[in-house]
């Protein structure tokens, strides 16, 4: 709590959102600083008392809206603003020596005040997010695209042993999801446009050659390779 109060003291001297971001970024143990889409709130992910905590503050009033942290070993790896009042987290966990961390493949969503929480993906996915159609949310995943013009959905990339990654569109409030596509090549990197729509993929062939694929929705063969 003492460390949180020290944040507020510094915060009271800052007048603009640009200054807010720059000032907090110079503090020790800061992992990430992001301002909300409406510019009214700021999220500061930092280590406090040995734990990674995300503090959401009101820029105008200097008040802490909520401190987000996890128990039982999980910690916040990264966070995203889905809207001015909704957050997305990717989680990690410390190794046995507590000096190394590894991603758990869990994707979590909550309001900025800690309400309406749901584990969207990973081994702790909630029941309503577990199965829709032919896909299970109880798989390792990460955020692939935040879909900036859609405040209720994100694109999640799921992993499995086949290494042909899958993209799913997921509702950040109830976990319902619909499949977008499967990668045309192992360990592909997907490409998106400004609207958050997948437009292609990049990957390596068995002959160790880089191949670019153009995504064509609703066709029997969804990808066309480009000669490079």
Tell me what each language-model feature is:
Residues 4-14:
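Sec-dependent N-terminal signal peptides
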Residues 18-228:
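Beta-propeller folds
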């Amino acid at each position: 709590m003492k460390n949180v109060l020290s944040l507020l003291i510094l915060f009271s001297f800052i007048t603009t959102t640009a200054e807010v971001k720059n000032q907090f970024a110079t503090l020790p143990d800061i992992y990430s600083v992001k301002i909300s889409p409406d510019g009214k709130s700021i999220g500061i992910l930092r280590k406090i008392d040995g734990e990674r905590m995300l503090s959401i503050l009101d820029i105008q009033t200097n008040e802490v809206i909520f401190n987000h942290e996890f128990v039982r070993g999980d910690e916040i790896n990264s966070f995203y603003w889905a809207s001015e009042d909704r957050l997305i987290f990717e989680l990690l966990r410390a190794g046995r020596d507590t000096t190394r961390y590894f991603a758990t493949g869990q994707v979590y969503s909550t309001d900025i005040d800690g309400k309406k929480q749901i584990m969207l993906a990973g081994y702790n996915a909630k029941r309503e997010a577990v199965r829709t159609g032919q896909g299970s949310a109880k798989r390792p995943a990460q955020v692939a695209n935040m879909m900036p013009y859609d405040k209720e959905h994100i694109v999640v990339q799921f992993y499995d042993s086949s290494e042909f990654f899958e993209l799913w569109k997921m509702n950040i409030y109830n976990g319902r999801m619909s499949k977008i596509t499967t990668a045309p090549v192992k360990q592909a990197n997907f490409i998106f446009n400004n609207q958050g729509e997948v437009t292609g993929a990049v990957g390596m062939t068995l002959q160790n050659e880089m191949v670019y694929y153009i995504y064509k929705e609703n066709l029997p063969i969804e990808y066309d390779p480009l000669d490079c």
